[in-house]
């Protein structure tokens, strides 16, 4: 219950709030209102209400806004700067009365009900969803305002937005993410400690219980450790991005003046206090004094640290602490401030995008979890280059083909060409060029054009008529002149020159088949044909980094070989070349009919590309931003896969359409980025998993018949295991691996087979580091997890120096297994030798240490008095060999000097089993060794639930 002072304060605040609600509001929230002051003055983010609850009412539905007469708003039309936009829409909030505004006004921002800054942000958004906290924007429509409204309300709002945005560029929003995750808040610290005390209080210990993790001998311990590590990480809740939020888990002692905050996490000091008092009572000693109790209680506290962090000092397991804090450090590397995240991601989008608005409190205290590291896609692409290339090219083609264009009619293009050539004797050649014009395949040629500028190794082909005509020459010329050199193979280049030579010199392919490129170029120049070169396109640096290419510059080839600085073709003499062609005498005729027709065609294509290249350049850059640099460098198509018909080629450039990438289409490209990013992330994760699988399951492959057979068997086992329930891989990878017609199983098998022997780096992300850390501890500290690599069997009559710190009767634990006992060396026998021994009576009578195997053990610690024993005899002797049964101890405390139990201990046992003391056991008197620190980041932090940054083209 709150104290009187708190109740009075709360009552006063409620009175203030009710007074504020009676006011008449002109805007959604006024800076000088009592509510605004309350919002500004909340002080202690740790304070709660009586029950810590958040209460606010959804209210009654009412009209969200009404549009009033536009003429009521003054409009600047006569100033030095004239505003050409339609007068803005004014929202009349007077007519809303207080229905919606009361919700915002009554939102519980009283300091006593605010838990932390996250709570404040949640309440701000909750209020905003049912009232107008922000006036409808003029350019950006925030969709979060739509919650709970009716279709009629939506019609009015959209009508207002449309009216406001007339004569203004419309806006589109989309989400851009870079490996972002929602952080899991861990509210309490897992300590995994159990305090065990004998019935009479004489003995007590603290045990860290992480569960039993049985291992198998003959199977790689590293691999088993990895499996257990994943399970343990999941059990501890650290396998996903998390943040510790335990700074408010404390209480204060009101019985005396004390400002300390006593932590409620971990093993309770009260339990330790009770155990110590029981132990003191057994020895007839007084209980802990008040001062000693306070000292013990103060061993588990919460205190503030730098940057507003809270340090919780608690009693917890040493292994739990090591694993938890390591995992915390790994995930925290990727937790950054919201503003830093915005700056990072702003570099990855076009300059004309801007981040959406966040609350001021989010900018001040906001944090985001993001992964900066990126896994490589090359292990998949290198091994499946043809399939991966085919997949992505076919994925891009339909999208690019659908780009809106402002097409020029073929009739107008034909008329222009006829007017340029003029003379009647040129008409047949003009007709040959114009009659074959078509736009049927323009969209696919346009898509191929974009792909040639997007990829370094995208090659195109073209097959000409066996008896070339003027259209073939026009198409070949367009290919050499307007397509980047890297997209034209040497064979295709020579073929283009041959086609030109055959037509322009009026010869046949047989005559020029053996001519080299240089010979062909010389022939054409001598004939008066100057267009014989391929041209290296200008590489343009992108203003943003491509997806999954952090910190890297993305590049693409500027379309049509236009230099973006001069806005002209990279061939400086292109202005003169048509004039040279026009006067040429081709095909061994006396007139220039062929030259004039081709010159007019070239001028039209030159002018078209010079006028329209910008739209294509923007289109290329937008799609190129979807492609990681490593795919830009590596993807390549097979020869002949993307051939262009000469008719389509000459038609495309002659009637080149202007790109009309409107807001809707650009928005489609923007939204595709999220799909591509998610797909890349999925593939990278699966590649990393597959590499880990290969490295774990297959060692270096020796080229011997036995090893190859063993490798094949192991591969079959792996495939059958990972495809037993459902495929380990996603639909995307299945599509890539099955392009050549194989099944998913066979495709994955073939790929894994290719990965064996390659030293591809494994993408090390936080969860991999965490699993590796747990695996290493699992191997190094085996006794924590219930297995050991050596045990000792001794006859009952031999006295063994045991670990007596815990007060067990006939303890099976030794600080370390002795190498000598009573001056005699203890025999060591490997498990494999022991299993084949014919007679073990002698070794048992002398005692021995068994090693070279993994021995699983479990134990129950009984609080009553008794004789420590094994659940059953562990030695198994048969005609075929010897073995060790599962080891399970029943361990009893020695609570008193019991003669009967002492005799039972000596008389009924032939041999005893000893192991090294499990490191998870701690005597009660050493309880301070269980004290560990955990750091909770400042409770003033606000973790952005949806960290995707929305960008708006304005």
From Swiss-Prot:
Q: Where is this region: Disordered?
A: 1-29
Assigned GO CC terms: viral inner capsid
Summarizing the function annotation, the protein's role is: Self-assembles to form an icosahedral capsid with a pseudo T=2 symmetry, about 60 nm in diameter, and consisting of 120 VP2 subunits.
Where in or outside the cell is it found?
Virion
- Give the superkingdom in one word: Viruses
Instruction: Tell me, in one coarse class, where this protein mainly resides.
Output: virion
- Name the NCBIfam families for this protein: seadorna_VP2
Q: Does the keyword Ribonucleoprotein apply?
A: no
Basic and acidic residues composition-biased segments = 1-15
Start-end of Polar residues biased regions: 16-29
What is the name of this protein?
Answer: Major inner capsid protein VP2
Q: Which keywords does UniProt give here?
A: Capsid protein, Inner capsid protein, Virion
Source organism of this protein record: Banna virus (BAV)
């Amino acid at each position: 219950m709150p104290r009187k002072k708190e109740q009075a304060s709360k009552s006063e605040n409620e009175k203030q709030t009710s007074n504020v609600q009676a006011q008449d509001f002109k805007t959604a929230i006024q800076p000088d209102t009592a509510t605004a002051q309350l919002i500004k003055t909340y002080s202690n983010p740790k304070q709660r209400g009586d029950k810590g609850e958040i209460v606010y009412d959804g209210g009654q539905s009412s009209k969200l806004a009404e549009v009033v007469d536009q003429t009521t708003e003054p409009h600047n039309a006569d100033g030095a700067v004239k505003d050409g936009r339609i007068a803005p829409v004014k929202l009349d909030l007077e007519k809303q009365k207080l229905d919606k505004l009361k919700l915002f006004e009554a939102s519980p921002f009283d300091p006593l009900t605010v838990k932390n800054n996250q709570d404040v942000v949640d309440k701000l958004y909750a209020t905003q969803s049912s009232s107008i906290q922000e006036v409808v924007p003029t350019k950006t429509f925030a969709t979060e305002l739509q919650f709970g409204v009716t279709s009629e309300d939506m019609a009015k709002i959209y009508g207002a937005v449309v009216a406001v945005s007339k004569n203004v560029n419309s806006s589109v929003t989309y989400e851009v993410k870079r490996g972002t995750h929602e952080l899991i808040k861990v509210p309490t610290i897992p300590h995994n400690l159990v305090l065990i005390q004998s019935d009479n209080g004489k003995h007590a210990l603290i045990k860290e219980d992480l569960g039993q993790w049985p291992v198998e001998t003959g199977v790689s311990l590293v691999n088993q450790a990895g499996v257990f590590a994943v399970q343990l990480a999941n059990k501890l809740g650290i396998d996903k991005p998390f943040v510790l939020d335990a700074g408010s888990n404390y209480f204060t002692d009101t019985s005396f003046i004390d400002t300390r905050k006593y932590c409620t996490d971990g093993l309770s000091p009260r339990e330790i206090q009770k155990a110590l008092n029981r132990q003191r009572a057994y020895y007839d000693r007084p209980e802990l004094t008040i001062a000693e109790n306070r000292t013990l209680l103060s061993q588990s506290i919460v205190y503030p640290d730098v940057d507003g962090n809270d340090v919780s000092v608690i009693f917890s397991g040493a292994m739990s602490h090591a694993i938890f804090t390591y995992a915390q450090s790994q995930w925290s590397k990727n937790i950054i401030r919201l503003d830093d995240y915005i700056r990072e991601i702003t570099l990855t989008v076009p300059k004309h995008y801007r981040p959406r608005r966040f609350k001021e409190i989010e900018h001040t205290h906001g944090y985001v979890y993001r992964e900066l590291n990126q896994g490589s896609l090359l292990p998949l692409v290198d091994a499946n280059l043809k399939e991966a290339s085919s997949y992505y090219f076919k994925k891009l083609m339909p999208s690019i083909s659908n780009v809106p264009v402002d097409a020029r009619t073929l009739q107008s293009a034909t008329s222009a060409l006829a007017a340029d050539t003029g003379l009647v004797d040129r008409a047949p050649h003009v007709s040959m060029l114009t009659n074959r014009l078509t736009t049927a395949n323009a969209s696919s040629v346009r898509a191929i054009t974009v792909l040639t500028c997007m990829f370094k190794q995208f090659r195109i082909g073209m097959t000409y008529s066996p008896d070339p005509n003027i259209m073939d020459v026009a198409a070949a010329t367009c290919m050499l002149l307007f397509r980047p050199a890297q997209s034209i193979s040497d064979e295709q280049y020579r073929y283009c020159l041959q086609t030109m030579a055959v037509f322009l010199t009026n010869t046949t392919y047989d005559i020029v088949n053996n001519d080299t490129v240089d010979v062909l170029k010389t022939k054409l120049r001598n004939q008066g044909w100057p267009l014989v070169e391929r041209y290296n396109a200008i590489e343009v640096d992108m203003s943003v980094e491509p997806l999954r290419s952090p910190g890297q510059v993305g590049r693409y080839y500027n379309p049509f070989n236009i230099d973006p600085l001069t806005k002209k073709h990279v061939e400086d003499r292109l202005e003169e070349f048509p004039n040279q062609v026009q006067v040429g005498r081709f095909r061994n005729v006396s007139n220039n009919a062929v030259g004039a027709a081709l010159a007019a065609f070239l001028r039209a294509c030159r002018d078209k590309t010079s006028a329209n290249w910008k739209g294509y350049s923007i289109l290329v850059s937008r799609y190129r931003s979807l492609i990681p640099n490593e795919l830009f460098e590596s993807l390549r198509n097979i020869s002949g896969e993307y051939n262009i018909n000469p008719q389509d080629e000459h038609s495309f450039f002659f009637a080149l359409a202007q790109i009309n990438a409107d807001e809707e289409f650009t928005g489609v490209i923007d939204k595709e980025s999220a799909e591509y990013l998610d797909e890349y992330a999925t593939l990278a994760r699966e590649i990393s998993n597959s590499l880990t699988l290969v490295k774990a399951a297959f060692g270096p492959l020796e080229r011997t018949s036995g090893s190859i057979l063993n490798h094949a068997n192991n591969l079959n086992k792996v495939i059958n295991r990972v495809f037993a329930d459902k495929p380990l891989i996603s639909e995307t990878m299945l599509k890539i691996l099955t392009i050549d017609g194989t099944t998913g199983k066979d495709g994955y098998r073939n790929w894994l087979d290719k990965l064996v022997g390659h030293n591809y780096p494994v993408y090390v992300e936080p969860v991999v580091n965490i699993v590796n850390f747990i695996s290493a501890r699992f191997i190094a500290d085996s006794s924590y997890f219930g297995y050991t690599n050596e045990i000792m069997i001794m006859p009952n009559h031999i006295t063994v120096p045991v670990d007596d710190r815990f007060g067990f009767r006939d303890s099976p634990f030794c600080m370390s297994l002795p190498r000598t006992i009573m001056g005699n060396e203890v025999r060591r026998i490997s498990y494999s030798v022991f299993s084949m021994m014919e007679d073990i009576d002698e070794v048992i009578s002398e005692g021995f240490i068994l090693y070279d195997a993994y021995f699983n053990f479990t134990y129950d610690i009984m609080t009553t008095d008794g004789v420590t024993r094994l659940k059953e005899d562990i030695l198994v002797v048969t005609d075929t060999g010897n073995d060790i049964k599962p080891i399970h101890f029943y361990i009893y405390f020695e609570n008193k000097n019991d003669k009967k139990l002492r005799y039972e201990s000596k008389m009924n046992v032939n041999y005893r089993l000893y192991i090294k003391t499990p490191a998870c056991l701690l005597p009660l008197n050493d309880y301070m060794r269980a004290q560990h620190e955990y750091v909770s980041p400042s409770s003033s932090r606000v973790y952005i639930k949806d960290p995707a940054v929305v960008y708006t083209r304005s």
